[in-house]
Each structure stands twice: as structure tokens, then as C-alpha cells.
Curated annotation (Swiss-Prot):
Name of the protein: YEATS domain-containing protein 2
CDD domains assigned: YEATS_YEATS2_like (cd16907)
Intrachain disulfide bonds: none
Keyword Nucleus attached: yes
Species, as recorded: Homo sapiens
Residue list for modification Phosphoserine: 118, 120, 157, 447, 463, 465, 471, 473, 536, 575, 627
Transmembrane stretches, start-end: none
UniProt keyword Translocase, yes or no: no
Length: 1422
């Protein structure tokens, strides 16, 4: 615009302003004076009125004062009269009786008598009440209305008695006796009963009033700090009623949930009285106050209190509002939780009489089920216990006092985790000796509503099956209650503190166990109906076993607990033996409390039963011997609501007939933390399967009784876990992967545990979301092989339906016979998991620590091996996972081919059991790519071997000698060992499943071409086990070599004919390995690459057919089983370049070529014409994919780019000197330059460790200083000056004589009138408008360009905008790449710093105009 002169407006702009300004001023002056006048008028009126009112009030006060004086005089007179009257009458009486009997006390007027009297005389109920701990009753009495006071009187006095007692015994935590709910301690039983008659509620509960209120105070502006503009200071308090202001004797702590604007400190915990919270603020909001009671049976309550701030702005403290809540608490829970154990009566025959009672009282659940507790008579049937001695029934509830005294300090933090009475309440006791060690944990300061710390406790025995009752939990949802430390007695009379683990959902009770006395005499034989599954089994209580109890909701029937101890009346079972040794092993159990609703577990009552009867012996040290001598039945978790427990196939199992009784199955868990525990019902959640997860480095040493180690089938108890579990969500609440460091032998030992054992692992992962989580390892995840000579097919059909039970939970890094961590899934059942026996010396003691990841998918829980040390729990791309049961069972009972793959840290461990039963172990190091000669063990006949060699999997089963002919197997980089045999030996034993792994022969392949496809064949059983579905294995192998090839397991469409029906159960193991062609795998759990699919099962109609499935590399679509079509990238003649128009005239370097190519092949594009098969529509869609699909898309894009690039380099001779890049490098380049969005998982690790910061500092480049000296310039200027001085100066004057202007001849021309055509201008975009404005400011006008005749558009502006955009784009992407170089461990840089941008500008040659490179240098010098 500035090229043309601006047109002058008609009026002077300043003049206008002046004319406008004048009236404004006048208006303002008028307004101000009017306002002042109004204010003065108001002031005078107010002053007059105030003066008038003051006079009136003063007069009133004088009148009141006068009357008060008169009233006082009257009162004095009255008092004098009364006193005189009293003494006169008293004197008369005394005189008449005679002076000797005169009692001096009579002359003391009643008003002073209570001060003179000795305190012992005050025995009236009122006085007694006044001296109890809640001494403020008198105040409240006068305040409360009389009728209210009278009705309360009875229960008050009783309550106070109890409180006083409890105060005397502050040190001894205990619970009221819960067996007989009407019974309070013996001494006060009768009074209590009377009180109950008068007041219905007072028998079990006491009403307590809790008042939440707040006071606030206005902060005047002058008192505020500069940076804190809060208007008020407020305090929220929690106190009792006027009658009993102190609440500390029953409130443990209070959580205040403040407004989100107080984050990150919006949850404040106050542990000690007074429960006050003072803060500053500027607004009112509802405060959620969560009161946690000392007794864990009282559910914590939430009180919403609306914070009211001072609206008067006086600056004085004013009361805002108060919220009053009445709470019903358990009588016995008041005070310091103790009552004299005088009422031990006859029940406590085994316990020392001095024990405090720890039998919990029932809990009143605020839920649909109000447990109406009638006094339960002593008929023990009603408690679901066998009719046994009194002692047995009650001893579980008493804790040894010595243990309590030993940990007095812990007592404050570790609240007693108690147990509900087993009347009609939500659970029944599970008997077991437990050692519970309090581990006080700091509660999570973040919102307790979301993440809770686990309760940690240690259990002794690794057996027993947990319960999950969907009935509403009466327990409080305490996140951090830790159990009491109980000292262990001898095995004979072990008495233990019961404990209960509360899930934080009120609607769920996870499980409760109470130890029972260990005396073996209490075993009662059950009727043999147990085995038929018709009646409910009678539970045994045994010192070393957990007895599961399940509860039926809203039903007075109890699902009684099936025995874990021997069932005496079972026809084939030998007699039980007593426990030997003390109970010493010590295992740690962590139960994670998960939010979520209780699922309604289908009531499929069925108990899984181990193929052999087992008997758990706990030897003194760390030994759990499972002897194949006793029958064990445990219920599946799905029985939680069923009243009958039907063991699935107990009948017809020949127990012990073929078995030499000398063989014992032994598991030793030495000092390890193998975890047992109750299953939380959250495991089987239908809503979102939050899994309870895991820790524990379990070091297990296997010592076999009789030298034979036999892994036992461990049943999955989580019935509904698989069937009901929805897709795992990823993200913070997703399936957290736990890294479990397990030596190979441990898995073998774990497998020996009796069915019903729940294994939990606690996570040990680095990322915060994974810490402390628990993962339940379903037993199916541990492959088991049993020593049973007659390998029964159906004996272990888990819980009647394998699909529900272990079937889905299968797949796991468990162990088969040879002992290593076999990755067998086995559908969680003996039939599905390979059964085998190992000969003596069956396990090698070579412990390879492997990390396993427990993968929780909708299909079940998988143990996934994860060798690479740098992978965090979330990104498991590099973890090598080999899953699936690769066992081939032979018909001989002696030996069995079992295949184990243990992926260790960079090593692969092969174990196979030969026919002789010896297990051979061979370790092949994956990272040292030498040729490892296979030892002779590997070429034993009949071995099945799975080899993990640099991302290539070859599975070879050979009949007899074929493998040994193979010689030493070569393992070299990127090549698969070629195996000569493709025949797999298939043995058919009727009634037994076999899985036979056949091998697709593979030539040695280079890394660039698609490699191994290995196929599995399924051999269905001739008589299939009904109801059994097993999970197909997972395979994800990431080679640890330089090229990131991956093998992704896809479940191809060819499997569809196999249809998932549960009539015949066979394991399918599919292992397509694609190196070059990437499969896109979409599966719901995005945290892990492998796709798990529902089990393909061969229908039983063709039982003998061998289905050979050859899996091709394909891309599964969104669903696990359906394929969307094959995207094979053709490397043949078809030109990739034809699809993309890339101008290469101005490009020189490989970087520029890459940039040009990557822009044509975007990973995320909204435009459909740019989209490739792998591109996403938006970043949201891209992040919606799981990590596998994201990686695959990234890889496909890199491959397409590589091909286009290669073609450009080949076709253009001027690029011949450039070396083509590998796909991996291109993928890395795309990621570094921001063409691939970073993984959301890796963005989460917030806090960098100090090492990261240090490496970052170390790796920061020395930034060259932008300062440059001007010496050269100065020197040149001085030279120039010198040069000019040397020139002669001639100044001659010149006269100008005349100026003649040339004459212009103006010729008038007639203007030809031509018709003006209409011109169309396309509207400019906001960006080009901005460019136009900026260019006009510097004096350049950009003219619109004619696109077409009479159509104009702002093309130049658009071009400049695009060019600027590209420039900034290049700089930022280069800066990001620089940031990637400096960031540690291939992390994503948190931010791009100035130094990164400076470095980027210096790195790009054509940006030297932005640097100081050419400053102070003349053009000709360059």
C-alpha cells in the first residue's frame, strides 16, 4: 500500500477526537457530582437513623439491667429462705432423735455435699454415666429433650460400660465374639440383653453422631500475599455431637477430598485428632469427607459437606455450615476394640484363657441383604462346619496375646483385619494356619478412589482355593489395612488370627480365611456323595489346608466348603496321615483391591479335581510335599453362588490303583514368595477384567521324595474369568504386566501345588502404574504333568467347563515334566495340559532367570516370557514370547516328549524329556551368534524342539532318529536351522489328547525375504473331553540382532473351519513367522503385541483327522479371528514409484530424498487419495490401535519408502553414489523426524531418574557460541580508509550555465471504450491474508494472479505461506531429531530446547542465512 500515497480523509482525525472528548468530560463531571450528592444524602440519613436507634437501644438496656437487679434480689431472698427452712427442719429432727446420733453430714446442704463426699459413694446411674469416657453426656442431657434422653438412657449406660472396659484394655485389639451374635462379653451379657429389649438397635450397634462443619474468615485484600489471591481462610472439622465431642476412640483417620483446583493436593489425610483441615480458597465447593473407623468392620463413610465461606466479609471467624450424620457402629468396635475375655466359657478349650476374644461380630451391611442375625444356636450345621468339637469351631478366632504384645508399635497403623461372623453373614471361615506379618504401607496420596495400595500379608501354605462371593461386602473399603502379626505356635495347637481381605468394592467379599487348630483329630470323614457331586461336601478343617468356603447370595443355605483334606470315605483313598513337622514356610500374599462391581458369577457348581489324590504336608522348613495319596477336591471360583459343589469327574477315576504309594510328589519352595491367596472376584469381573497382580522372586528347589518330580495339574479356579472378561483396556488401568523373575525350576515346582492353589505375583515393574499390582496366575497358566500312570483324559476337566475355567485361562509359562519353564498352556486342565512323568533326576538344577509377563487378555491369563532387560513393563515389543503347549504325549506312561522353551535374558533354553525320562537342557545364546553344536542330548530320538534363533522359529518333531542325523544344529544370524524331517510322529492313545507339532521345512533365508512359516497339526482325541476349550498359544519373537524383525502370531482365517466348539478339546499352536512382511495385528489389549484368540477346537465329529494348518503371513483385521485380506508387498516387477509423483530435480542428499518421499507416503492422513493401506485417518485413530498394529503400520510405511527410494536411486544415475537405507533405518528416521507419532506408553514415565538427567547432560552437544569477533571487518574497514587517503583530492568548481527542459508534446487520443468484464476474486485464506498484511507493512503489494480468465486468487501469498511452513517444519523436525540423539535410552525427548533448534539450523546447510556464518565477510571473500 505504501507504494501509493494514502488518500487524505475529509476531516482531520485529531479534530474529531477533540470534539468527541468534550461532551464526555462534561458527562463525567455531572455524573461524579450527582454521585457525591447522593452519597452525602445517604450518609446523613444513615447517621440520623443510627443515632435514633442507639438511643432506643441504650434505653432498652437500662430497663433490662434494672429488671435483672430486681430479679437477683428476689433470688437471694428466696435462697436465704430455703436454706433457713432446710436447717430449721433438719435441726428439729436431729434434736428429737438425740444428739448422739447426730450425723454431721446432715448439716451439709445438698449443694455442697457432692464436693465433700468420697467418690466411692456416687453409685447412681447418672453419676456413673458422668464418669465414663464420654464424660460430656451431662451437657447433652440438659440440651436434649427429655423424652429423647430417657429413651437413650439405658443403652447409654451400657455403652459406657463397654467403653470403659475397652479403655482399660487399650493394648489388646480384639473383636467381640461373633459366633453367637447376641452375645456380648460374659460379664455384661445380661445387662446387655435387657438393654436390647428396650431398644432394638442397641444390641449390635451404637448410634454415633458425626458432625462435619466449617468455619471461615475473610482475608482483606491488604493482608493477602501477592501470589496468593485467596479470599478466605477456612477450616473443616470433624467432631462428635455435643454429647460426645471426641470421636478419636472410633475414628482412625479422615480423608478430605477437596476441589480439583487444589490438585495435586486435593486429597488430604488426617490421621490424628483433632480432625481439622485448614486451607485458603476463593470459592465454595462440596467437600467429600471420608471417615475411616478403627474397626475395619465398620464401613468407611463418605459425608458430603458443602463448604460455606463468610459472606459478611467482616474478617472475623464465622461458622459456615454443619452437616450432621448419624452412624451405626458395632458395639464391640468402640473404644480400643477390646472386651474382657471372661466369657471364654467352654468354647475355648484349646486356647489359653487369657486370650482376648477375636471373634468378630456380624456386620450390618448397608445393602440389599440385611443380615438378620438371630442368635445362632450351637448346631454347627448352620455354620457350614462339620459337627465337630466346640474347640475346633472357635479356636480359629483367638489370637495369641504374646504376638500382639510383640508388635505394639505396628498396632496403630495395622488395623486388625478381621473376619465376619459366620452366622448368616457374608462369609464363613476358611481354616488355615497363616502367618500374617504387618507391612505398613503408606497410602497412595493420589485419589484413593482410583488407586489403592494392596494389603500385604504372608501366608503359610500354598494351597487352598479362594472364594469370591458376590454378596455385598460388609467390610469397609480400607485401602491400607495391614494384618496383625501373629506368632506361630507348634503344629499341634496352632491358633491364629483370622484375617479377611477386603476388596474395596462394597459389593464384594474376596475371601476370608481363618486358621484352625492343627490337631489332626478333627478330620471327619465325609459321605461318598461328595464324589458324586450330589450333596454338598462337608468341609474339613485341617491345620495345613485352606478350606474354601463359598457363599450363596440372599440365601440362608451355605455352600459348604469342599475338603482339601483327605475325604475319608472315598472308596479308593488311603487313610489320612497327620501333618509332620512344624509349619514353617513363609509365603507372601498381596491382594490388590480393585475398584469395580461384583460380577454375578454364573452358578455352575463344579469342583475341579486333581487327577491324583494329594495330601499336603508342610514340613518344618520350606517344604510342601504333595503325596499322591489323598483325594483333594476344590471348587472352582464359579461356585461362588451355588449351594452344591459338584466335583466334575470324581467318579470312575482309578485313584492310586496303578500308583506305587512310594512315589510322592514334592514341591519345595525355599524361602520363595510363591503366592497363594483368595481370588478376588474382580478377577472374574464381567465389566472390565481388572486383574489382581504380582511379585515375587520365587526361588524353588525341588527335592523329590522318591526322586521323582512330577508336576501337578493346577486347576484354574477363575470360572468366570475367561468367559466374562471383556477386552482389557490399555492405559493406566489396563492389564499391567508384571515382570516375574522365575528360575526355570520354579515353574516346575509351582505346578506341583494342589489344585485350588491360586498363585499371585506382585509386580516389580519400573513404571509406576505397574507397581504393587497383583496378577493372579490361573493354574492353567502353569503346565502340569502328573505322575499318574493311567493318564485319565477327563479327570481334570476343570470345573466342568474348560471354557470357563482353565480353558480360557490356559497358555502359560508353566512347567511340564522336564522342569524348565515350559510355555504350556494346557487349558488349565490335566487333560489339556500335557500329562507326563519324568524319570529320576527329572529336573535340572540349572536356574535360568527369565522374566515372564503375565498377560491378561479376554481369552485368559498368559505368562509371556520377556527376556530383554530394557523393556519396561508396558512396551513389550522386544520381549520374546513363546507360548503354547508344545507337548507331544506318548502312549507310554514312562516317558513323554515335552518341549520347553525358556526365553532367558538373551538366551534360549531348550529342555526336552526323552523317552528315558531324562530332561536335557541346552542353552543357546541368542546374542552371541555363534554356531552352537547341538549336544547329543538334543539329537535324542523323539525329542520335540522349538528353536528360537534370531527371530526365526523352527519347530521340528522327528520320528525316532531323524533328528540325530541332522548333526549339530547351526544357528547363525538371521538364519533358521534347516531340519531334514517334516514328519511328525503322532501317537494316538485313546482318551488322551495329543498335540503334535509338525514343521514346515525352511531353507536358510536372508533377512530380507519372508522366512519361516511353521505349521502345527492338531490331533483331536478319539473320545474328546466335553466342555473343554483351550487357548491357542501366543508367539512373539523379537530378534535381539540389529534388524528389528518380529514374528507375530496371527490366527489365520484358515482356522475358521475348526470352529470354536467345546465338544473336543485340542490345543492349536500356530506360529507364522514373518520377517519382511509385517502382520498387522489388532487385538484389544494394546500393551502387548501378540494377539490371543479364542481357542480353535477341532470338532469331535472327525476325531482322528489331522488338521494341518499352514499359516501364511497375513494381516488380521480388527477381530482376532477374521482376516481382512492379505497385504503382501511384491518385490517383483511392479513399480512402486508409479504410484507416487516425486520431483527429484532439486534434491541432492539422501535426507532430502527421504523428506520428499515421506511426504508422499504419510502414516496419518485425512485425505483419502494419499491414504495407503496402512495409514490412519487421524492421530486419534492411530493411537486407538494397539502397539502391534501401530508398529506394523510404521514398518509397512518404512518398507514402501525404502522401495520407492531404491527405485529412485536406481533410475537416476546422479544418485548412484548414495547407499540405499535399510527399512529399520528408515523407520527410525521417520520416528526421529516426527513423521511417526510417539508411543503414548513411552510418554508416561514422568520422573526421569538422576541417571537419565546425567546422561542427558553428558550427551548434550557443545553448542558453538553464536558470538563472533568483528576483527576481520575492522581490519578491512581500516584498509579501505588507508586506500581512500592515498587518492588525490581534486575539487574543481563548475558553473552551470543553463537548464533546458525537453518539450513534451501532448497528443490527445480518444479513449476506446471497451467493455469492463466482471472479475472474480477467490477469497483468500486467513493465512494468505496475514501474509498480505505483513508484506504491505514492508511496502510490497502482492497482486492477485489470474488462475483462469477473469478468475483471480492470492497465489503468491499461498506460496509464501507454504514455503514458510515447510521451512519451519524442516527446522522443527531436524530439532526433534537432534533431541532424539541427546535423549537417553532411545526415549522420546520431553521437549525441544533452544539448543536443539540452534543445532538443527546449523545442521541444515541451506539455513546458513540464519546463522552467523557469513557475518562480517564480504562477498568476494567467499
Amino acid at each position: 500500500m505504501s507504494g501509493i500515497k494514502r488518500t487524505i480523509k475529509e476531516t482531520d482525525p485529531d479534530y474529531e477526537d477533540v470534539s468527541v472528548a468534550l461532551p464526555n468530560k462534561r458527562h463525567k463531571a455531572i455524573e461524579n457530582s450527582a454521585r457525591d450528592a447522593a452519597v452525602q444524602k445517604i450518609e446523613t440519613i444513615i447517621k440520623e437513623q443510627f443515632a435514633l436507634e442507639m438511643k432506643n437501644k441504650e434505653h432498652e438496656i437500662e430497663v433490662i439491667d434494672q429488671r435483672l437487679i430486681e430479679a437477683r434480689r428476689m433470688m437471694d431472698k428466696l435462697r436465704a429462705c430455703i436454706v433457713a427452712n432446710y436447717y430449721a427442719s433438719a435441726g428439729l429432727l436431729k434434736v428429737s432423735e438425740g444428739s448422739k446420733t447426730c450425723d454431721t453430714m446432715v448439716f451439709n446442704h445438698p449443694a455442697i455435699k457432692k464436693f465433700l463426699e468420697s467418690p466411692s459413694r456416687s453409685s447412681s446411674p447418672a453419676n456413673q454415666r458422668a464418669e465414663t469416657p464420654s464424660a460430656n453426656h451431662s451437657e447433652s442431657d440438659s440440651l436434649s429433650q427429655h423424652n429423647d434422653f430417657l429413651s437413650d438412657k439405658d443403652n447409654n449406660s451400657n455403652m459406657d460400660i463397654e467403653e470403659r472396659l475397652s479403655n482399660n484394655m487399650e493394648q489388646r485389639p480384639s473383636r467381640n465374639t461373633g459366633r453367637d451374635t447376641s452375645r456380648i462379653t460374659g460379664s455384661h451379657k445380661t445387662e446387655q440383653r435387657n438393654a436390647d429389649l428396650t431398644d432394638e438397635t442397641s444390641r449390635l450397634f451404637v448410634k454415633k453422631t458425626i458432625v462435619v462443619g466449617n468455619v471461615s474468615k475473610y482475608i482483606p485484600p491488604d493482608k493477602r500475599e501477592e501470589n496468593d489471591q485467596s479470599t478466605h481462610k477456612w477450616m473443616v472439622y470433624v467432631r462428635g455431637s455435643r454429647r460426645e465431642p471426641s470421636i478419636n476412640h472410633f475414628v482412625k483417620k479422615v480423608w478430605f477430598f477437596l476441589h480439583p483446583s487444589y490438585k495435586p493436593n486435593d486429597l488430604v489425610e488426617v490421621r490424628e485428632p483433632p480432625f481439622h483441615l485448614t486451607r485458603r480458597g476463593w470459592g465454595e465447593f462440596p467437600v467429600r469427607v471420608q471417615v475411616h473407623f478403627k474397626d475395619s468392620q465398620n464401613k468407611r463413610i463418605d459425608i458430603i459437606h458443602n463448604l460455606k465461606l463468610d459472606r459478611t466479609y467482616t474478617g472475623l471467624q464465622t461458622l459456615g455450615a454443619e452437616t450432621v450424620v448419624d452412624v451405626e457402629l458395632h458395639r464391640h468396635s468402640l473404644g480400643e476394640d477390646c472386651i474382657y475375655p471372661q466369657s471364654s466359657e467352654s468354647d475355648i478349650s484349646d486356647a489359653p484363657p487369657s486370650l482376648p476374644l477375636t471373634i468378630p461380630a456380624p456386620v450390618k451391611a448397608s445393602s440389599p441383604i440385611k443380615q438378620s442375625h438371630e442368635p445362632v444356636p450351637d448346631t454347627s450345621v448352620e455354620k457350614g462346619f462339620p459337627a465337630s468339637t466346640e474347640a475346633e469351631r472357635h479356636t480359629p478366632f483367638y489370637a495369641l496375646p504374646s504376638s500382639l504384645e510383640r508388635t505394639p508399635t505396628k498396632m496403630t497403623t495395622s488395623q486388625k483385619v478381621t473376619f465376619c461372623s459366620h452366622g448368616n453373614s457374608a462369609f464363613q471361615p476358611i481354616a488355615s494356619s497363616c502367618k500374617i506379618v504387618p507391612q505398613s504401607q503408606v497410602p497412595n496420596p493420589e485419589s484413593p478412589g482410583k488407586s489403592f495400595q494392596p494389603i500385604t500379608m504372608s501366608c503359610k501354605i500354598v494351597s487352598g482355593s479362594p472364594i469370591s462371593t458376590p454378596s455385598p461386602s460388609p467390610l469397609p473399603r480400607t485401602p491400607t489395612s495391614t494384618p496383625v502379626h501373629v506368632k506361630q505356635g507348634t503344629a499341634g495347637s496352632v491358633i491364629n488370627n483370622p484375617y479377611v481381605i477386603m476388596d474395596k468394592q462394597p459389593g464384594q467379599v474376596i475371601g476370608a480365611t481363618t486358621p484352625s487348630t492343627g490337631s489332626p483329630t478333627n478330620k471327619i470323614s465325609t459321605a461318598s456323595q461328595v464324589s458324586q457331586g450330589t450333596g454338598s461336601p462337608v468341609p474339613k478343617i485341617h491345620g495345613s489346608s485352606f478350606v474354601t468356603s463359598t457363599v450363596k447370595q440372599e440365601d440362608s443355605l451355605f455352600a459348604s466348603m469342599p475338603p482339601l483334606c483327605p475325604i475319608g470315605s472315598h472308596p479308593k483313598v488311603q487313610s489320612p496321615k497327620p501333618i509332620t513337622g512344624g509349619l514353617g514356610a513363609f509365603t507372601k500374599v498381596i491382594i490388590k483391591q480393585e475398584p469395580g462391581e461384583a460380577p454375578h458369577v454364573p452358578a455352575t457348581g463344579a469342583a475341579s479335581q486333581s487327577p491324583l489324590p494329594q495330601y499336603v504336608t508342610v514340613k518344618g522348613g520350606h517344604m510342601i510335599a504333595v503325596s499322591p495319596q489323598k483325594q483333594v477336591i476344590t471348587p472352582g471360583e464359579g461356585i461362588a453362588q451355588s449351594a452344591k459343589v459338584q466335583p466334575s469327574k470324581v467318579v470312575g477315576v482309578p485313584v492310586g490303583s496303578a500308583l506305587p504309594s512310594t512315589v510322592k510328589q514334592a514341591v519345595a519352595i525355599s524361602g520363595g514368595q510363591i503366592l497363594v491367596a483368595k481370588a478376588s472376584s474382580s478377577v472374574s469381573k464381567a465389566v472390565g477384567p481388572k486383574q489382581v497382580v504380582t511379585q515375587g522372586v520365587a526361588k524353588a528347589i525341588v527335592s523329590g521324595g522318591g526322586g521323582t518330580i512330577v508336576a501337578q495339574p493346577v486347576q484354574t479356579l477363575t470360572k468366570a474369568q475367561v468367559t466374562a472378561a471383556g477386552p482389557q483396556k490399555s492405559g493406566s488401568q489396563g492389564s499391567v504386566m508384571a515382570t516375574l523373575q522365575l528360575p526355570a525350576t520354579n515353574l516346575a515346582n509351582l505346578a506341583n501345588l494342589p489344585p485350588g492353589t491360586k498363585l499371585y505375583l506382585t509386580t516389580n515393574s519400573k513404571n509406576p502404574s505397574g507397581k504393587g499390582k497383583l496378577l493372579l496366575i490361573p493354574q492353567g497358566a502353569i503346565l502340569r504333568a502328573t505322575n499318574n500312570a493311567n493318564l485319565q483324559s477327563g479327570s481334570a476337566a476343570s470345573g466342568g467347563s474348560g471354557a470357563g475355567g482353565g480353558g480360557g485361562g490356559g497358555g502359560g509359562g508353566g512347567s511340564g515334566s522336564g522342569g524348565g519353564g515350559s510355555t504350556g498352556g494346557g487349558g488349565g486342565t490335566a487333560g489339556g495340559g500335557t500329562q507326563s512323568t519324568a524319570g529320576p533326576g527329572g529336573i535340572s538344577q540349572h536356574l535360568t532367570y527369565t522374566s515372564y509377563i503375565l498377560k491378561q487378555t479376554p481369552q485368559g491369563t498368559f505368562l509371556v516370557g520377556q527376556p530383554s532387560p530394557q523393556t519396561s513393563g508396558k512396551q513389550l515389543t522386544t520381549g520374546s514370547v513363546v507360548q503354547g503347549t508344545l507337548g507331544v504325549s506318548t502312549s507310554s506312561a514312562q516317558g513323554q516328549q515335552t518341549l520347553k522353551v525358556i526365553s532367558g535374558q538373551k538366551t534360549t533354553l531348550f529342555t526336552q524329556a526323552a523317552h528315558g525320562g531324562q530332561a536335557s537342557l541346552m542353552k543357546i545364546s541368542d546374542s552371541t551368534l555363534k554356531t552352537v553344536p547341538a549336544t547329543s542330548q538334543l539329537s535324542k530320538p523323539g525329542t520335540t524342539m522349538l528353536r528360537v534363533a534370531g527371530g526365526v522359529i523352527t519347530t521340528a518333531t522327528s520320528p525316532a532318529v531323524a533328528l540325530s542325523a541332522n548333526g549339530p544344529a547351526q544357528q547363525s544370524e538371521g538364519m533358521a536351522p534347516v531340519s531334514s524331517s517334516t514328519v511328525s510322529s503322532v501317537t494316538k492313545t485313546s482318551g488322551q489328547q495329543q498335540v503334535c507339532v509338525s514343521q514346515a521345512t525352511v531353507g536358510t533365508c536372508k533377512a530380507a525375504t519372508p522366512t519361516v512359516v511353521s505349521a502345527t497339526s492338531l490331533v483331536p482325541t478319539p473320545n474328546p473331553i466335553s466342555g473343554k476349550a483351550t487357548v491357542s498359544g501366543l508367539l512373539k519373537i523379537h530378534s535381539s540382532q540389529s534388524s528389528p524383525q518380529q514374528a507375530v502370531l496371527t490366527i489365520p482365517s484358515q482356522l475358521k473351519p475348526l470352529s470354536v466348539n467345546t465338544s473336543g478339546g485340542v490345543q492349536t499352536i500356530l506360529m507364522p513367522v514373518n520377517k519382511v512382511v509385517q502382520s498387522f495385528s489388532t487385538s484389544k489389549p494394546p500393551a502387548i503385541l501378540p494377539v490371543a484368540a479364542p481357542t480353535p477346537v477341532v470338532p469331535s465329529s472327525a476325531p482322528a483327522a489331522v488338521a494341518k494348518v499352514k499359516t501364511e503371513p497375513e494381516t488380521p483385521g480388527p477381530s482376532c479371528l477374521s482376516q481382512e485380506g492379505q497385504t503382501a508387498v511384491k518385490t517383483e516387477e511392479s513399480s512402486e514409484l508409479g504410484n507416487y509423483v516425486i520431483k527429484i530435480d532439486h534434491l541432492e542428499t539422501i535426507q532430502q530424498l527421504l523428506t520428499a518421499v515421506v511426504k508422499k507416503i504419510p502414516l496419518i492422513t485425512a485425505k483419502s487419495e494419499d491414504a495407503s493401506c496402512f495409514s490412519a485417518k487421524s492421530v486419534e485413530q492411530y493411537y486407538g490401535w494397539n502397539i502391534g498394529k501401530r508398529r506394523a503400520a510404521e514398518w509397512q510405511r518404512a518398507m514402501t519408502m525404502r522401495k520407492v527410494l531404491q527405485e529412485i536411486l536406481e533410475k537416476n544415475p546422479r544418485f548412484h553414489h548414495l547407499t540405499p537405507l535399510k527399512t529399520k533405518h528408515i523407520a527410525h528416521w521417520c520416528r526421529c523426524h516426527g513423521y511417526t507419532p510417539p508411543d503414548p506408553e513411552s510418554l508416561r514415565n514422568d520422573g526421569d531418574s538422576i541417571e537419565d538427567v546425567l546422561t542427558q547432560i553428558d550427551s548434550e552437544p557443545e553448542c558453538p557460541s553464536s558470538f563472533s569477533s568483528a576483527d576481520n571487518l575492522c581490519r578491512k574497514l581500516e584498509d579501505l580508509q588507508q586506500f581512500q587517503k592515498r587518492e588525490p583530492e581534486n575539487e574543481e568548481e563548475v558553473d552551470i550555465l543553463s537548464l533546458s527542459e525537453p518539450v513534451k508534446i501532448n497528443i490527445k487520443k480518444e479513449q476506446e471504450e471497451k467493455q469492463e468484464e466482471v472479475k472474480f476474486y477467490l477469497p483468500p485464506t486467513p493465512g494468505s491474508e496475514f501474509i498480505g498484511d505483513v508484506t504491505q507493512k514492508i511496502g510490497i503489494t502482492l497482486q492477485p494472479v489470474a488462475l483462469h480468465r477473469n478468475v483471480y486468487a492470492s497465489v503468491v501469498e499461498d506460496m509464501i505461506l507454504k514455503a514458510t511452513e515447510q521451512l519451519v517444519n524442516d527446522i522443527l523436525r531436524q530439532a526433534l531429531a537432534v533431541g532424539y540423539q541427546t535423549a537417553s535410552h532411545n526415549r522420546i525427548p520431553k521437549e525441544i530446547t533452544v539448543s536443539n533448534i540452534h543445532q538443527a539450523i546449523c545442521n541444515i546447510p541451506f539455513l546458513d542465512f540464519l546463522t552467523n556464518k557469513h557475518m562480517g565477510i564480504l562477498n568476494e571473500d567467499q
